[in-house]
């Protein structure tokens, strides 16, 4: 048996706890039966479905994230990282072992719900929805643990605020669909719901199960790679690139006109741009990281350069490749492009805008200080992208695109066919200025870093 899984079972399970859970659930079932004796089967199904969601999604998610936080706060995470377990063994051992007691109660609730649904209508549909809820919950746990490991700073004793925010986002995004899936009226027909996925026209339950399985696969991939990073197992960022493309492919299936042409490439580009910001603000991009990249580029094989490279350039390069493919597959003539004027120009502007924002982030990240650059970056983007253009637009509307190139979209609303020259010239000016500032920051901090290294 997996040693990490066995250790978590030893911590979570005991004969007393194993006996308490079914006893409490039996009392809850008795209460539900007493409150609604006319239709006890439906009441039991609804009540224990809600309990299933509460135990697995709510309590189980807290246990999964706490399994990492407790290791860090109790100073045992370093011992975990020195174990002989592979990243995959450590990952699934923690994933299923830390929430084993919550899953014990959740599976008991699911069993009661299935028995209560035996004599009801569309029994198999209810079972499929419960399966969707279980698979989606495991996917949620995998994504939560992966995000916590991705943002983990072992030098800090306090839990990461970013991890807490990611936990809230994932919990909200996953809990609501799971509740909908489990409590959906089984007497209603299995409609298409969100629309046919990739034009297959599957029933909503089967479609949701397929999407949940895909998200689970991507979550396990992210968890395995994040655990490998914490265990100091070097790897090239192929898993990140595959995850970004896989998530974009899942989303592209719900597009109004899904296909392997322009709609797919546009969705992949948007997903890659979003992941660029995610990697930028959750990873360390300080001077030491880029010094390691430059060192390996000069003295090591290419593989070591890829291993040391942060993830945001990978996402940005993926977005650029997808935009090139979008342009080559007649993206400007697609149905979506006809509905949104100058969509191709807006996408290229978004690509350059993302590169500019990454440069602003690095201007603050390359400082010789321990202060995190996130707050100053967001403040700069707000002032540069909202406050100053809004002030200038009231007096001189033509100057607003020079401060925020996306203000050139106003020309599209007025019937123009493109963003206008001022928007593109403004973006070019931004890139030149930001590149100069980053180069100055790098050269200004290099002597200080060199002196501190020699002193050590």
Language-model features: locations:
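Hydrophobic alpha-helical transmembrane segments of membrane proteins
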Residues: 1-74, 93-456
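Short helix-to-coil transition segments within interhelical loops
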Residues: 79-88
């Amino acid at each position: 048996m997996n040693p990490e899984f066995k250790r978590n079972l030893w911590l979570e399970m005991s004969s007393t706890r194993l006996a308490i859970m079914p006893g409490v659930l039996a009392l809850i079932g008795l209460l539900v039966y007493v409150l609604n004796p006319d239709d006890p089967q439906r009441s039991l199904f609804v009540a224990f479905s809600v309990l299933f969601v509460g135990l697995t999604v709510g309590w189980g998610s807290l246990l999964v994230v706490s399994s990492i936080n407790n290791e860090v706060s109790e100073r045992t995470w370093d011992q975990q990282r020195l174990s002989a377990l592979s990243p995959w063994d450590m990952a699934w051992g923690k994933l299923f072992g830390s929430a084993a007691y919550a899953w014990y109660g959740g599976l008991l609730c699911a069993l009661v719900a299935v028995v209560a649904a035996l004599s009801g209508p569309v029994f198999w549909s209810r079972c499929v929805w419960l399966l969707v809820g279980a698979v989606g919950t495991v996917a949620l746990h995998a994504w939560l643990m992966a995000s916590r490991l991705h943002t983990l700073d072992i030098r800090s004793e306090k839990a990461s605020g970013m991890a807490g925010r990611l936990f809230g986002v994932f919990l909200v995004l996953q809990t609501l669909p799971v509740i909908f899936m489990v409590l959906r009226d089984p007497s209603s027909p299995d409609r298409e719901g969100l629309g046919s996925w990739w034009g297959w026209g599957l029933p909503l339950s089967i479609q949701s199960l397929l999407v949940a399985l895909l998200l689970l696969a991507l979550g396990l991939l992210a968890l395995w790679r994040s655990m490998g990073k914490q265990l100091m197992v070097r790897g090239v960022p192929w898993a990140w690139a595959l995850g970004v493309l896989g998530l974009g492919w899942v989303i592209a299936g719900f597009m109004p006109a899904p296909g392997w042409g322009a709609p797919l490439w546009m969705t992949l580009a948007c997903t890659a741009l979003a992941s660029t910001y995610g990697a930028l603000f959750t990873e360390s991009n300080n001077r030491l990281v880029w010094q390691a990249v430059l060192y390996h580029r000069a003295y090591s094989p290419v593989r070591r350069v890829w291993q040391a490279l942060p993830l945001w350039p990978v996402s940005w390069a993926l977005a650029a490749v997808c935009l090139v493919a979008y342009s080559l597959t007649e993206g400007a003539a697609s149905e979506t492009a006809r509905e949104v004027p100058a969509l191709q120009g807006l996408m290229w502007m978004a690509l350059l805008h993302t590169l500019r924002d990454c440069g602003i982030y690095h201007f603050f990240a390359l400082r010789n200080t321990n202060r995190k650059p996130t707050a100053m970056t967001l403040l700069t983007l707000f002032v540069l992208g909202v406050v100053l253009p809004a002030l200038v637009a009231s007096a001189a509307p033509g100057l607003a695109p020079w401060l925020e190139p996306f203000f050139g979209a106003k020309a599209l609303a007025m019937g123009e066919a493109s963003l206008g020259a001022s928007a593109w010239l403004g973006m070019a000016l931004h890139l030149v200025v930001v590149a100069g500032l980053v180069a100055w920051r790098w050269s200004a901090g290099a002597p200080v870093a060199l002196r501190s290294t020699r002193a050590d």
